[in-house]
Amino acid sequence: MMHLRNITAGNPKTKEQYQLTKQFNIKWLYTEDGKNWYEEQKNFQYDTLKMAYDHNGVIICIEKDVSAINPEGASVVELPDITANRRADISGKWMFKDGVVVKRTYTEEEQRQQAENEKQSLLQLVRDKTQLWDSQLRLGIISAENKQKLTEWMLFAQKVESTDTSSLPVTFPEQPE
């Protein structure tokens, strides 16, 4: 099975490559050990999965046809077309680690960023939910029921805002009904 690591753009290495670059604006891609991406494609088997992954091991492309992959800035590995490998996708939740496809493990910094994103999403949800009630309150035309809902959502917003996303794990308060 093929495994081409750290593929980057480089200059043409032969006169023929130079002419092709000049004529068709071809970008030449090479592995960290100097192999030409285009020449190596013929060495991949037709009945396997080809996965491109970034420098963190996160899977960014999955194809059966290796020529459909743009591997610039990534590595490409060939894997058997079996259920364990087919379950992966390019959502960012899968990685190639130690020779196998696994669920992604997030760094603490990534987990903190995810928590901060969730916090901002929840605060936007509060703004969306309460916008009409807030206008009704300002105009003095809010019903008692909606005033109660507005209060519950604003208390929820206060709890969300005070949630510390710098220490893991982060637990957010329950949303009002």
Curated annotation (Swiss-Prot):
Domain of life where this protein originates: Viruses
Localization in the cell: Virion; Host cytoplasm
Keywords assigned: Host cytoplasm, Host-virus interaction, Late protein, Viral attachment to host cell, Viral receptor tropism switching, Viral release from host cell, Viral tail assembly, Viral tail fiber assembly, Virion, Virus entry into host cell
A single GO cellular-component term on record: host cell cytoplasm
One GO-annotated biological process of the protein: virion attachment to host cell
The keyword Transport is assigned to this record: no
Position of the signal peptide: none
Main location per the UniProt record: virion
Induction per the UniProt record: Expressed alternatively with tail fiber assembly protein U'. The switch from S-U to S'-U' is performed through inversion of a DNA segment called C by the phage invertase protein Cin.
Role: Chaperone involved in tail fiber assembly. Expressed alternatively with tail fiber assembly protein U'. Remains associated to the tail fiber and participates in the host receptor binding. Two alternate tail fiber assembly proteins U and U' are encoded extending the host range of the virus.
Similarity remark: Belongs to the tfa family.
Name the record gives this protein: Tail fiber assembly protein U'
Organism: Escherichia phage P1
